[in-house]
């Protein structure tokens, strides 16, 4: 399975958003990772539909939307209509997770589930074969620029074994604190998609940083 890099738009310069979108378009990155936060499920508020619509208008790569919100079912069709290709919801935010996953797929998007750092992988056993992607939070969700949680390597490996055992075929995405210092170890543990925010957009040369990260993971 190809290893992918997904710059997180949460870390972009919102006064120069189109510039940063074009940078990602012209880089070696594979996806746009877009965090939607409601100030309820997580303490922070990021951005909503108008910003996503503007991003989708210019983005030329896969749009990977990560919902950190309560009751995500309310907006599934809206995100599909706005151009999201992948929609990931949090295990901790869904009352009827299987129904939510089926609704995402019915709307034409790939379906993902995110789990917080201290949520065990075992909660995914009954749903893993329905998923296209699992997003492991390697920081506590809600803010960019946090330090990487070391237990992520163990969880990634556990998830890899679950996917292999069930023949699910879904991707493993790591979100939070990803840099060139931990990228290879994450891929070796079983990850396929690395989300990088502050590491990319805080760099002097984001395009070069993406290229280096992409080259390092093959």
Locations of regions flagged by a protein language model:
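Acidic, divalent-metal-coordinating active-site segment for phosphoryl/phosphodiester hydrolysis
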Residues: 177-189
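Conserved N-terminal beta1-alpha1 strand-loop-helix module at the mouth
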Residues: 1-88, 92-96, 103-106, 111, ...
